[in-house]
Amino acid sequence: GSDDFFGLLDETEGEWSPQTSSERIDVGIGRFPVNTLAQARGLMQKIQRYESAESLGDWRNRFVFVADDDFPEVERNRDLHALNADGTAVEIDKNGTATRVDKIYMLSYPVENSAEGRRLAGVRSDMIRAFNEGALVVNYSGHGGQFVLSDEKIFTVDDVPLLTNADRPTIFVTATCQLGRYDDHESSSWA
């Protein structure tokens, strides 16, 4: 699914092609991923806890940027995702606020080849730590599937039970494909 219809507001926008267009949405679109009234109530309670004074802390000043290495498409720009993430990180950090910016860029990690395929030592544990220590935003730029981030499987739905940040809920932003299949009612994916 795409939110382009709702987020591209100019009359001349909407014919997006990665080769010919540099259009950016004018307004961010979000949704509550619920299917039942009980899920909606639970989400509302979570938001109320988040907005309460008990939820305040230094973790709300932290942004974590995670960038894929664009493997296996080595003929393309391998640091494309790092450049995209870094551009956003610079904008967040340039106002001289108390914001802390941390980076988990896959290009910076050693590669391990195993029977399971290509893996990057430490990325998965660093991502889990980023969530668990608390961050206002964790922003991922890169490849993704319905239940996994990156070809190297740096984070999967099976990792979600390892998260212990219920009292420090993170806004998880992903610039990837297939991850939040809100338009597929047969599967819950990450949406």
Predicted feature residues:
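Cysteine-dependent hydrolase recognition
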Residues: 1-191
